Amino acid sequence: MKKILVPITSLILLTGFDQLTKYLARHFLSASPKVLIDGVFELRLTFNTGAAFGILKGMNWLFYVFAAIVLAAIVFFYKKYSNYPKLKVIRILMIFISSGIIGNLIDRIFIGSVTDFFYISLIDFPIFNVADIYISWSMVLLVILLIFKFKESDFNGPG
């Protein structure tokens, strides 16, 4: 039971935190941006109908299909490798990625776009949200781990 309870609870808490931050952004940032560090970082509300960096605007159906495929693959991976202690960190990253996908999917389903609000003005970085952080940083760490830490044999059997 604990094997499924911890990941599901983590998924719910992470997704809930993402949704809470988006709710707060929609309610407190609608009037004007809040500059936290002048010329560096601000909270600026925007609604993104596209993917990362605003690509594929207005193609929500594509995001639904992509989210379903990726989430199915993550569930498959998680179940297949749930007894592999060496792969625990990968399973944790999968929870963060899933939470990010679900968080942005909730926005698309209920408001038709994704709520973004973090803006790094110093480098004019595209506006993003907590779910985007979950996805992007987890993917970066996952790629680094797969290239530098894990070997093919780590996926062949528990141990």
Each language-model region and where it sits:
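Alpha-helical transmembrane bundles and membrane-interface segments of multipass inner-membrane proteins
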Residues: M1-G159
